[in-house]
Regions:
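TPR-repeat structural position
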Residues: 2-3, 28, 59
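Structural marker of alpha-solenoid helical repeat scaffolds
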Residues: 9-12, 38-41, 72
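Terminal, low-structured helical/coil segments at or just beyond the last alpha-helical repeat
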Residues: 71, 75-97
Length: 97
């Protein structure tokens, strides 16, 4: 998929899909900017924010959003276990239990 085209098309919407397009095109700072304006009580937003923060090397903040995601929807743990990019956050979380 052409993620840069998706960014171009979704940029005006400033929503979850726009953030996902930014992240997929490796525009992580732009993705985080959009996510910062979205609802932190949405587990999908928290999950994506955790992933972007992890990419940016902000592990403590990423862990915070990963745990928040799980608090809102425990099933997201299963999703994270299947996502190689979330491996470090899952491992850190498992070490804390």
């Amino acid at each position: 998929m052409d993620y840069k085209k998706a960014v171009y098309l979704l940029r005006p919407y400033d929503d979850y899909n726009a953030a996902l397009a930014f992240m997929s095109a490796d525009y992580n700072h732009s993705a985080l900017d959009v996510l910062s304006r979205l609802d932190d009580t949405d587990p999908k937003v928290c999950y994506l924010k955790a992933m972007v923060l992890s990419r940016l090397g902000q592990q403590e903040e990423a862990q915070k959003y990963y745990r928040l995601c799980l608090a809102y929807d425990p099933y997201m743990r299963h999703r994270a276990n299947l996502d190689p990019e979330m491996h470090l956050l899952v491992k850190q979380d498992n070490n804390n239990y």
